[in-house]
Amino acid sequence: EMQRSLVGSEMCIRDSLFSEPLPSPQELYAAGGLDGLLERTLSYNQKLKAFGVNVNFAPVCDVSTNPDNFIYARSFGQDAQTTADYISSVVPVYAQSGVACVLKHFPGYGNNADTHTGIALDARPYTTFEKSDLVPFESGIAAGAPFVLVSHNIVECMDGAYPASLSAKVHTLLRDTLGFTGVIVTDDLAMDAVKAYAQDGSAAVLAIQAGNDMIVTTDYQTQIPQVIAAVQSGEIAESDIDAHVFRVLHEKQALGLID
């Protein structure tokens, strides 16, 4: 089983496991520059590895320089290129520690509202994403990041009908335009931004149809049978399931979890 963590302001692992909580990337960068941040990131992930954690849902690639934005405190807090430089430097640190990293929240939060509590519409033009939001993701992918997490934002210039996590168009952008060949994972399907699009509980089916390889959810008892039924009916092609499983198994092999 893959285990997960979150770091800094993303903290999910119990603080009691560590002598002190890990500060956010912004705080570490302000205190010790990029070198200090990378050193602490390596140390933290080595501890996670010792605890049996093999996937860390970080780093945050979202570009935000406005403290009033929802995502700001969780972001690097710098412009697109500085954030991209951080991402390209930190991805190899995760690899060095033996803990896989997850670039998030594709295609970028910007100044959007919190999708934990409702729908977030992003009306910015695609040129803004090209010049800003996508740059850190491109940097992380080029550095070899094995996972990308897709947000629930509705990005109108990419797909105005569905949240990014449920959008085949957004996943095609990630695969074909950005050239990502690793594992795509959803943001939490229990978040309110998704519920309006899957009121019958079919979020996992929609997510797999969109192109996600892994699902973040707590509603397994309902969603697993729905996915199985969708495969049996042909609503989800078995060849697609095979492709998703292959990518997950490839990453498990890279982490030394299977031979």
Identify what each model region corresponds to.
Residues 1-12:
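Single conserved hydrophobic/aromatic residue that forms the stacking wall/gate
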Residues 78, 85-232, 237-240, 247-250:
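Second-shell residues forming the walls of enzyme active-site clefts
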Residues 43-56:
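Acidic-leg catalytic submotif of subtilisin-like serine proteases
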Residues 14-22, 54-73, 100, 104-121, ...:
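Active-site-proximal loop/short-helix segments
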Residues 30-46, 80-85, 129-130:
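Glycine-rich anion/phosphate-binding loops
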Residues 19-32, 77:
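A charged helix-plus-loop insertion that forms the helical arch/lid used to bind
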Residues 249, 253-259:
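A short C-terminal boundary segment appended to hydrolase-like catalytic domains
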